[in-house]
Amino acid sequence: MAKKGIREKIRLVSTANTGHFYTTDKNKRNMPGKFEIKKFDPVVRQHVVYKEAKIK
């Protein structure tokens, strides 16, 4: 069987409280902290900060 990978799936949730989110993965070894990135939120039609959250 294959070894479990180092990358973990995460959810990027909009800080504009629209409920919109992106899913992606990140390398746990290179980025151990919480991930934040500015991306486009189609609900408010603006670029807003997205913060990392666990996938349920």
From Swiss-Prot:
Keywords: Ribonucleoprotein, Ribosomal protein. The keyword Ribosomal protein applies. The keyword Ribosomal protein applies. One of its GO terms (molecular function) is structural constituent of ribosome. Gene3D superfamilies: Ribosomal protein L33. GO terms for biological process: translation. InterPro entries: Ribosomal_bL33, Ribosomal_bL33_CS, Ribosomal_bL33_sf, Ribosomal_zn-bd. GO terms for cellular component: cytosolic large ribosomal subunit. HAMAP family: Ribosomal_bL33 (MF_00294). Belongs to the bacterial ribosomal protein bL33 family. This is Large ribosomal subunit protein bL33.
